[in-house]
Every structure is written in structure tokens, then in C-alpha cells.
């Protein structure tokens, strides 16, 4: 039997997932890797450790599936977006650590560019706000701060890539230097209307075009792996940034369909169809995928700290031993005890876009307990997502967001999902397969080689596991939102 192998390279771990034709998981492996924090608000990864982790999980997933590499029809890749790597074109060695999407070191540069009115140019061309979140200013920082980097880049000696590009480069032993439209749309360098690297934006950031990878569809045959990676040559035929892969995996293929991925951060996407809508209200517009020479666009809202707030309570405050314990701890109290937790550890994303906000726990009294704090932390994940969806709905006049499909690790938390439905006042639907990010890239890869025949077949494979319906009293909901908004205002512009 033939399978599709999906490589899901995330912010804190690398996964390999093997799917069959019915979207059943036949093999799975996961490996965490080191988070590097050189300075406050700086976040880095070791690119070589990431590649090593992928080699490990590929072999382990194949072993768990009790199959061999020659039974893999194709490989799909999905990845943490915006995270930036620059490496030597000849040796393949990175010249600096990967600068992670959460990293805020270029916030001041973004402010300087905004003061010159450049943010409006970036918004109209890329659909993005001018923020340290995206790859463009990270590339500039490396070129400006690593000795000799700019000269080498101008000579064509260096390659830039987001994580997908780095994976394909290594899988093919440097033969292929590509990215797909979805990842490219998060760099601040792609014109999402012309579908080309934009020379004006490259000039503003002083980035040589020779650094950049070739642009590709999200579902097409790019080439084959080098035999050294898995012992045989395998077709690589799907690439999408993690949130866009999850949108595809959730079968949100029609205009108006929405999903939220609860991972390290939370990422809400709404399918807006085949034409980009540039939103002035701080909602991002991105390319979700390119397939059959057609582009699908989404609105996206990004919450920087979602499930990571639970990780922080576990590791930094040691309130519980395992992240999975958070639900039981939070459920042991009926409410948050008047506590509101704004986890702005690296600033606030959509719709606030405040890099100078910082984390805050407010409302503490002598009767406050770790249970109240844990519940407030869980609620903060849903409340931040509520802010995003409210802004999106206000920006979309032609259709109503009627349900939210959910995935990611924290979507398994029933207390959180019920609270999300209550706050949103709409159904929250969890699918049977919650590894939707990996599944989406598998679908894109499989469609390119005929493993699956059509988008309609993908839609038919999606199955609901549980529907959470809103049940909270109106007055209680309004109080929670009112106090949350007060807390957000206090956390803003802290530094």
C-alpha cells in the first residue's frame, strides 16, 4: 500500500505523520528541540538541529507505520512561517541561527520605517502590517549584523529561506531552492497581487534579490529527495505554511469558512476566495495556497502566545507537571476569581499590533489560587481569539462566520473549547483528526500526484468529532469581555 508522508516542522517540535487514502494516521513521530533566548524578546532556533530532528522523526514514523520509504508516494511539507534562515549556497551551512517568528528584535526598525510612511506601501502590496513578526526585517537584521553577510549576499553566495525552503534544500542536498506562495506571502517581500517578489520592497529593506528562492504553487511536483535522506528518491509535491495547511486540512475550501489553530500561538483564518481584500483594520491578508494555477486568499489573525501560556505556567511557575493537567486544574474552580491574564510576553498581535505590550496578571486578591490563575490563562487563549474573530467579522460584510473549526494541541481541551463557543456565541467544531496541519500538507502533496483526485474528495474526508454549542448567560459573557478589554488596555505600551 502507498502512503503520503507529511513533515510538520513547528515552533517547538518536528513531526512526521504518515497518512493513508482515507486520511487515517498510520505512523507518527514527534521530537522537541531547543528554544534559544539570547536576549529578552529574542527567539532563535538551530537550523541544523531542526534538520536533524526531521531526519529522526521520518525514520521513526516509518518504523511505527511498519512500512518502507519506497511505499511513500509523495512528501508534503508544512512549517512554522516567517522564521528566517540564511545559509551558504555552496556549503549549506547557516551563517546565523534561525530567527523565529516570535522574535521582536526588529521592532525599532519597523517603527523607523513606519515613521517614513512605508507601512502603507507594505500593506497595499503584501496585505501585511509592517511588523517584526515577518521575515523581511529579520533578513535585513542578519545582513546588517553578521560580519560579511551583506557583501556575500550581493555576490550571490547566500540563500534565504523560510523553514520550508530549508527542508527542501536539505532533502535534495542543495539541488532545489524554492518556496511556495503561502510561505512567500509572509515575508513582507511578495506582492500578493502580481505574485512576484517586489523590487520596491526589496529596495526599501536593502535585500538583494539573488538571496530569494524560486516561487512555486503549493501543490505541484517540485522534484525528488536525494537518496541519502531516506534511502530512496521520493517525490516532494506539497508545501504550505502551517496555518494555511491547517486551513486546507480542515477542508475550509469555500469562502466564509473559518478555522483556529491552537498551538504555540493561535491563528485564525477565514477563506475570502480568489481575490485579495486588503483590510485597513489590522487584519492580515495572505495567500493560503496556490493550486492548479489558482490562488486562494485568507484573512488571518495572529495571537502570538496561545498554548504557550500553559507551557509557561508549567515550566516557569511550575504550577503543574504536564500541560495536559491544566484542564483539570482550571476546572476545579467555577470561574477565574476575578483574575485576567494577558500573555503579551512578546507583545500583542491581531488586532492590537503592539510590540511594546507585556504580560500581565491582574485582579489578584488574597483568595486567588493557582487554579484561578490557570483558568485565567486558559480563558486568555479564547479571549484573544475572540478579539481576532470580532475584528474579522466587522471587516466582512458579505458573509457571516457561522462556525469555527478548531485544531492544534489545545483544541483537545474541552473546557477551553466550551469557553470559546460561549465567548464567540457560535458553534466550535473539533474534527476527528486534529493533526490537520500535517493532513493539509499531505492533501496538497497527494493531489499533485493523483493520490487524491479532487477538492471534493478532500471535503468528503473531513469528519466532526465534537460540537461545542454556546451556553453562557449573556450578562456573564458581557462582564468577561468588559474586564478583558480593561486588562488589555493596561498591558499595552508597557515598554
Swiss-Prot record:
Pathway: Polyol metabolism; glycerol degradation via glycerol kinase pathway; sn-glycerol 3-phosphate from glycerol: step 1/1. InterPro entries: ATPase_NBD, Carb_kinase_FGGY, Carb_kinase_FGGY_CS, FGGY_C, FGGY_N, Glycerol_kin. ATP binds at residues 11-13, 264, 307, 311, 409. ADP binds at residues 11, 15, 264, 307, 409, 413. PROSITE patterns: FGGY_KINASES_1, FGGY_KINASES_2. Key enzyme in the regulation of glycerol uptake and metabolism. Catalyzes the phosphorylation of glycerol to yield sn-glycerol 3-phosphate. This is Glycerol kinase. It comes from Borrelia hermsii (strain HS1 / DAH).
Amino acid at each position: 500500500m502507498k502512503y503520503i508522508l507529511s513533515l510538520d516542522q513547528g515552533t517547538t517540535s518536528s513531526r512526521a505523520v504518515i497518512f493513508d487514502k482515507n486520511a487515517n494516521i498510520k505512523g507518527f513521530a514527534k521530537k522537541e528541540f531547543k528554544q534559544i533566548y539570547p536576549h529578552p524578546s529574542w527567539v532563535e532556533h538551530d537550523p541544523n538541529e531542526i534538520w536533524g530532528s526531521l531526519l529522526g522523526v521520518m525514520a521513526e514514523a516509518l518504523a511505527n507505520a511498519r512500512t518502507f520509504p519506497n511505499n511513500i508516494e509523495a512528501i508534503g511539507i508544512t512549517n512554522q512561517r516567517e522564521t528566517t534562515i540564511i545559509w551558504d549556497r555552496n556549503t549549506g551551512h547557516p551563517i546565523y541561527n534561525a530567527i523565529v517568528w516570535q522574535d521582536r528584535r526588529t521592532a525599532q526598525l519597523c517603527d523607523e520605517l513606519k515613521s517614513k510612511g512605508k507601512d502603507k506601501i507594505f500593506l497595499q502590496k503584501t496585505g501585511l502590517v509592517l511588523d517584526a513578526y515577518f521575515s523581511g526585517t529579520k533578513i535585513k537584521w542578519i545582513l546588517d549584523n553578521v560580519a560579511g553577510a551583506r557583501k556575500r549576499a550581493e555576490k550571490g553566495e547566500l540563500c534565504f529561506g523560510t523553514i520550508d525552503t530549508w527542508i527542501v534544500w536539505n532533502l535534495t542536498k542543495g539541488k532545489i531552492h524554492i518556496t511556495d506562495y503561502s510561505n512567500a506571502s509572509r515575508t513582507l517581500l511578495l506582492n500578493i497581487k502580481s505574485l512576484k517578489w517586489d523590487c520596491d520592497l526589496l529596495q526599501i529593506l536593502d535585500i538583494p534579490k539573488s538571496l530569494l528562492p524560486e516561487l512555486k504553487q503549493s501543490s505541484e511536483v517540485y522534484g525528488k529527495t536525494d537518496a541519502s535522506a531516506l534511502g530512496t528518491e521520493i517525490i516532494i509535491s506539497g508545501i504550505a505554511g502551517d496555518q494555511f495547511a491547517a486551513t486546507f486540512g480542515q477542508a475550509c475550501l469555500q469562502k466564509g469558512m473559518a478555522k483556529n489553530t491552537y498551538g504555540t500561538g493561535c491563528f485564525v483564518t477565514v477563506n475570502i476566495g480568489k481575490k485579495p481584500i486588503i483590510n485597513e483594520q489590522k487584519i492580515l491578508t495572505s495567500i493560503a495556497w496556490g493550486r492548479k494555477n489558482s490562488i486562494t486568499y485568507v484573512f488571518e489573525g495572529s495571537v502570538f502566545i496561545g498554548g504557550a501560556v500553559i507551557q509557561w505556567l508549567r515550566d516557569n511557575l511550575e504550577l503543574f507537571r504536564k500541560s495536559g493537567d491544566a484542564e483539570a486544574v482550571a476546572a476545579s474552580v467555577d470561574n477565574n476569581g476575578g483574575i485576567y491574564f494577558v500573555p503579551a510576553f512578546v507583545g500583542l498581535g491581531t488586532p492590537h499590533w503592539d510590540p511594546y505590550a507585556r504580560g500581565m496578571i491582574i485582579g489578584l486578591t488574597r483568595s486567588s489560587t493557582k487554579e484561578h490563575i490557570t483558568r485565567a490563562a486558559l480563558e486568555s487563549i479564547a479571549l484573544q481569539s475572540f478579539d481576532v474573530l470580532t475584528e474579522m467579522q466587522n471587516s466582512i460584510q458579505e458573509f457571516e462566520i457561522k462556525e469555527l473549526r478548531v485544531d492544534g494541541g489545545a483544541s483537545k481541551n474541552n473546557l477551553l473549547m466550551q469557553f470559546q463557543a460561549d465567548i464567540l456565541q457560535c458553534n466550535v467544531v473539533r474534527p476527528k483528526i486534529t493533526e490537520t496541519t500535517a493532513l493539509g500538507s499531505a492533501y496538497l502533496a497527494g493531489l499533485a500526484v493523483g493520490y487524491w483526485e479532487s477538492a471534493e474528495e478532500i471535503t468528503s474526508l473531513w469528519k466532526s468529532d465534537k460540537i461545542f454549542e454556546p451556553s453562557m448567560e449573556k450578562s456573564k459573557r458581557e462582564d468577561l469581555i468588559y474586564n478583558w478589554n480593561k486588562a488589555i488596555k493596561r498591558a499595552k505600551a508597557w515598554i
